[in-house]
């Protein structure tokens, strides 16, 4: 943003540094997402660029950590086109392991049994967050169903929160992904609509503080 414009409106920080503007619809959706996480399964949060997906993801993670009733795990791999189910298993092992030498087995059968053992040891529901999930390969999306079931077989609960562009929701509606898409809970961050004037006023005031 131009320095001259900021000075004209009396702002001391850019729009990107402002807090998140919460509408009533957003607050309801945020609450519903948290309820869905407690129940487990695949949860998709989608929206266009700049709508607030990453901010919402961070808020969810922060709330869950503060409440300390659900364990938070997240995939940090940046190139989601190359993320596969092994990458997500690694993320879970890194975040859930209680011992430094608790390494993930490379053989699939042993890996899943070890994960089940960790689930029983931690004895809490788990939330696995994946940002930029619209770049995930369809095979990886399908594998998420098996990952959730592996945790359920150990009497655990796993929620996979996939965050991405509207393409993610379209992919999950594809008949080829019906196996996972039919079970997914979809949430969409929408436009402000009638709240736009309030948002502009709030944004300028927020950047003055």
Where are these regions (language model features)?
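Conserved Walker B catalytic segment
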Residues: 42, 116, 120-162, 167-170, ...
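Walker A/P-loop nucleotide-binding motif
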Residues: 39-59
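Short regulatory helix/loop adjacent to the ATP-binding pocket of P-loop NTPases
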Residues: 61, 168-183
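A short, basic N-terminal segment
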Residues: 1-40
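AAA+/P-loop NTPase substrate/partner-engagement loops
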Residues: 66-91
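Conserved NTP-binding/hydrolysis module of P-loop NTPases
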Residues: 6-13, 83-102, 206
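Conserved AAA+ ATPase "sensor/coupling" helix adjacent to the nucleotide-binding pocket
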Residues: 91-96, 166, 175, 198-209
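Conserved AAA+ ATPase "SRH/arginine-finger" region at the nucleotide-binding site
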Residues: 185-197
């Amino acid at each position: 943003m131009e320095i001259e414009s900021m000075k004209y409106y009396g702002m001391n920080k850019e729009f990107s540094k402002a807090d998140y503007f919460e509408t009533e619809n957003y607050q309801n959706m945020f609450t519903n997402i948290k309820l869905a996480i407690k129940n487990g399964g695949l949860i998709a949060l989608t929206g266009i660029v700049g709508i607030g997906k990453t901010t919402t993801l961070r808020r969810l993670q922060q709330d869950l950590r503060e409440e300390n009733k659900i364990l938070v795990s997240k995939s940090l791999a940046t190139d989601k086109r190359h993320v596969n189910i092994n990458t997500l298993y690694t993320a879970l092992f890194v975040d859930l392991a209680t011992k430094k030498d608790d390494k993930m087995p490379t053989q699939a059968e042993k890996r899943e049994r070890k994960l089940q053992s960790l689930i029983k040891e931690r004895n809490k529901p788990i939330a696995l967050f994946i940002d930029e999930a619209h770049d995930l390969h369809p095979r990886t999306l399908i594998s998420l169903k098996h990952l959730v079931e592996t945790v359920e077989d150990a009497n655990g609960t796993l929620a996979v929160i996939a965050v991405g562009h509207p393409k993610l929701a379209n992919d999950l509606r594809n008949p080829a992904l019906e196996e996972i898409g039919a079970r997914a809970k979809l949430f969409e961050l929408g436009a402000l609509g009638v709240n736009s004037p309030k948002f502009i006023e709030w944004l300028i005031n927020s950047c003055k503080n």
